[in-house]
Amino acid sequence: MSQRLKTLYQDSIVPKLTEQFGYSNVHEVPKLVKISVNRGLGEASSNAKAMESSIKELSTITGQRPVITRAKKAIAGFKIREGMPVGVMVTLRSEKMYSFLDRLISLALPRIRDFRGISPKSFDGRGNYSLGIREQLIFPEIDYDSIDQIRGMDISIITTARTDEEGRALLREMGMPFRES
């Protein structure tokens, strides 16, 4: 099954970015490497049900089973010991990555209340973009009646872009709704 965003990238984005940045080789053009979806669960140590529901939700949203992240060090202030589960994470690559990004851009982000676009400043200096989502209900796969608590998640989009400007141009061409500042 060919992904809409992947064919868009190959057919129109690569020539546009090659012309815009003056690349001499098509392999210089920035491309998506992976998308990491992460959810930190502070209450996971005391509430096993929160972990189960988060695993179920993330696997429904991404189409891939998440891995449980564990504490690297014990922190007494947070009442966690080394090795305790503290969150869940999914790393998406290739077909699932393009499918998820397409659903995020065209279905999920427009469903955010008072949505005026996402911040164009959340790049890390190397062309990678991170955004936080406050509630999982923006994804159409999640049924309102089946959730026990509203939880957010962090989404990181990792690209091969060398600068923020290249990464921003790549994501804007893919249809990412950046806010006009």
UniProtKB/Swiss-Prot annotation:
GO terms for cellular component: ribonucleoprotein complex; ribosome. One of its GO terms (biological process) is translation. The keyword DNA damage does not apply. Signal peptide: none annotated. Keywords: Ribonucleoprotein, Ribosomal protein, RNA-binding, rRNA-binding, tRNA-binding. GO terms for molecular function: rRNA binding; structural constituent of ribosome; tRNA binding. It holds the Pfam family Ribosomal_L5. Part of the 50S ribosomal subunit; part of the 5S rRNA/L5/L18/L25 subcomplex. Contacts the 5S rRNA and the P site tRNA. Forms a bridge to the 30S subunit in the 70S ribosome. Belongs to the universal ribosomal protein uL5 family. This is one of the proteins that bind and probably mediate the attachment of the 5S RNA into the large ribosomal subunit, where it forms part of the central protuberance. In the 70S ribosome it contacts protein S13 of the 30S subunit (bridge B1b), connecting the 2 subunits; this bridge is implicated in subunit movement. Contacts the P site tRNA; the 5S rRNA and some of its associated proteins might help stabilize positioning of ribosome-bound tRNAs. This is Large ribosomal subunit protein uL5. The lineage of its organism: Bacteria, Bacillati, Cyanobacteriota, Cyanophyceae, Oscillatoriophycideae. The gene is rplE.
